Amino acid sequence: AVPTLVNDYTDGLLDLTVELAGNERRPSEMRLEAGLFDGETKIFAETRDVEVFDSLAVVELTAEVPDVNPWSAESPSLYTLVITLADSRGRVLESVSSRIGFRTSEVKGGRFLLNGKAIYLKGTNMHEHDPVRGHTIDEALMLKDIRLMKMNNINAVRTSHYPQPERFYELCDEYGLYLIDEANIESHGIGYHPDITLANRPEWLGQHMFRTVRMVERDKNHPSVIIWSLGNEAGDGQNFVETYKWIKGRDESRPVQYERAEKSTRTNERHTDIWCPMYPSIERVESYALSEGQPGFDRPYIMCEYAHSMGNSTGNLQDYWDVIEKYGILQGGFIWDWVDQGLLETSEEGEEYFAYGGDYGEVGSPSDGNFCCNGLVGPDRTPHPALTEVKKVYQYVGFNPADLTRGLVTISNKYDFTNLSYFTINWEVLANGILFRSGNLRQISLEPGDSLTVEIPWGDIAPAPDTEYHLNLHVSRSDEWGIVPQDHMYASEQMLLPFHAAAKTAASSVASVAAGASGEESLALIDTRTEGSDLTFAGEGFEVVFDMAAGVMKSYRVAGQELIMSGPRPDFWRAPIDNDYGNGMEKRNAPWREAGGRA
């Protein structure tokens, strides 16, 4: 079934191909009925009389369905398609059903469009992983993943690096997640050189094609699958040109992508519809956008992997999205990755922990250490701090100060298909962190992509001395939104308010000294003296000594007591994090570790 949208994306078009296999030598007269249901209501039905032989019979049906509810991750509207085969006397022989969604997925004018609209893919990569069962996951864990993603504004998953269990696709159809479905093809270890990669060896075409066909034929009816991926890190060559061509001939309703397709040295045949690099720098991302219109820079740019979230990481995510939201050709990316692949173990002391490379086998066994633990959540789906950052950066409601002295704030609706009238915006003013005023803005009607400046009605504020005022904004829904519980907070913002009590008017002590003031209100003059390389500043009850040769403070005494063992020195080093070790930073920047000691 290929359900798409026509007539300015308002009506549905259902192209249905049914294959019938007979088991008798003589033809059998059959009746085929296709019915489409919206809930319990049948909105379309068509019947065909067919003759079925022992060979395959193909029946094609096309129908236009007016005023359908389009499927999207924000509004995953599904219809039930029921196909029934009966004999000539009307007895039902077989009946099958499938839940389908009407939507379009295409690349036009250098943009990836869903239902005719350029959208952002705020995605993550995901491996199958259970901390106890390993690669075997059940429906409860699938639902937990989907719920967590939706609660943290993630709208897309790349099924790295193989198709997921079919039930996962059904749940993504139902609750709304965009999927890049990736063929189970990776030959990273072979190497990428055109002379050795399996992608260029004709004897491996069959295996490339087999895995591609299997994925497409199994998953083709799922509306959540919006893009096909030819594989991952498997080099590039003619085999991928052929699998690309096969998909485009079999399914015209989705784009196809492959990261290595832009790195081929043996073929000039284009075989990716999307420019989908791995781990580009922010400068490289912007460079692509600035090159739009030049040869080769005419496709949407969606990173298939970025923001490697291993350990203490994901810190520059906002910097990426500042650039992404600046240029139309940049349309998001997929964080690496969703879940740490640790396994639950119990220590000799009876404490549970998550084990990874190095915890198994004899000492010295080959291991990638904790390289399998680079997720936004732990193996048990406990969120890491990075997920909080992802939720904030990916949020769909933006706030910017317009004129905070008058309480004016500009609200932007970054949803693709959802009006903000479904949400409540709660606000609160804090005085030194303590609640001072609060209220809410209900039913602000704001269409996707629009902005509106509103007044926050906090009234008159008489600033208190030594008090900081902040405005907090929170966006929530009072109802359940699919799999997300009611009253969940989807977006937030904090702004420092420009309210300050008038400063006390008093002449500064420094000014008094400079003017030669005397008496109790003046400070005692600081004594300065030099002895060798020592420069000393002394005043009432204190003394500070600097070593001018070394350029450091060597002594700080108060009331005759020494307060320091040695003075501060410049430090140009920080503790490396996991991603630093991954790219050799601790070796590359080693001279800076000792630079402070030589300063």
Language-model-detected regions and their locations in the chain:
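Secreted/periplasmic carbohydrate-active enzymes, especially glycoside hydrolases
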Residues: 1-166, 171, 175-176, 211, ...
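Substrate-binding/catalytic cleft of secreted carbohydrate-active enzymes
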Residues: 146-149, 156-373
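Short, glycine/charged-rich beta-strand-loop motifs at protein surfaces that mediate ligand recognition
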Residues: 376
